[in-house]
Structure formats: structure tokens, C-alpha cells
Amino acid sequence: LSTLNTHNLPLLRLVYLEREDLVAVHVDDLNNQANQLDQKLDGGLLPQGHAPHWLMNAHSLFYLTRLLVAQCRAPKGMLVVLPAGVAHWCLNDGKHYLDNPR
């Protein structure tokens, strides 16, 4: 992945690896989704006590991502390897849910 980052790929958001069940996602995208999720939770748009387990798991993932960013262990533009299903939720299904919580 560090080699990929030196090959001028800042606009490439999703990189499929040799293993189909793993993908590389830009840490910037995860960080942006984390901020959106926090705003929805803080604004009371999502029921905190009754949030689905997958939503809380995503929140944990986003929190860890932001922790890595804050500690400069995941610099801007870095690619993070995730299971394909998790990456798909973070960048697609999760965004749809956050935009349409009801």
C-alpha cells in the first residue's frame, strides 16, 4: 500500500486488492463519514439507545480511524485495508442510512 501511495493515486478512492474480500479505502473518506455520524448522533437524529448493532460497530470503526488520524499514524491520503463488506457499508449503505435515518 505504501508503494501504491507513491504512484500518484490520490483520486483513487477504492483499490481492489488481489484478495476479493479485502479493499483499500482512503482514510479521508472514513474520517468524513465519522464526522457525519457524530453530527447525526449529537443532533438526536439517530436513536442512541436503539441504534442497530452495525451502526455502533461502524461508529467504533470511525472512532478508531479518527484516533489514527489524530495521532498522525494514518496521514491524509493513506489507504486503509478493510473487509470489503465493511468498506461498502462505510462508503455506500452507511451514507444512505445517515442521509435517510427513518
From Swiss-Prot:
Keywords: Allergen, IgE-binding protein, Seed storage protein, Storage protein
Domain of life (superkingdom): Eukaryota
InterPro entries listed in its UniProt record: RmlC_Cupin_sf
One Gene Ontology MF term: IgE binding
Keyword Transcription regulation carried by entry: no
Its job: Seed storage protein.
Family, per entry: Belongs to the 11S seed storage protein (globulins) family.
Protein name: Legumin-like protein Mac i 2
Organism phylogeny: Eukaryota, Viridiplantae, Streptophyta, Embryophyta, Tracheophyta
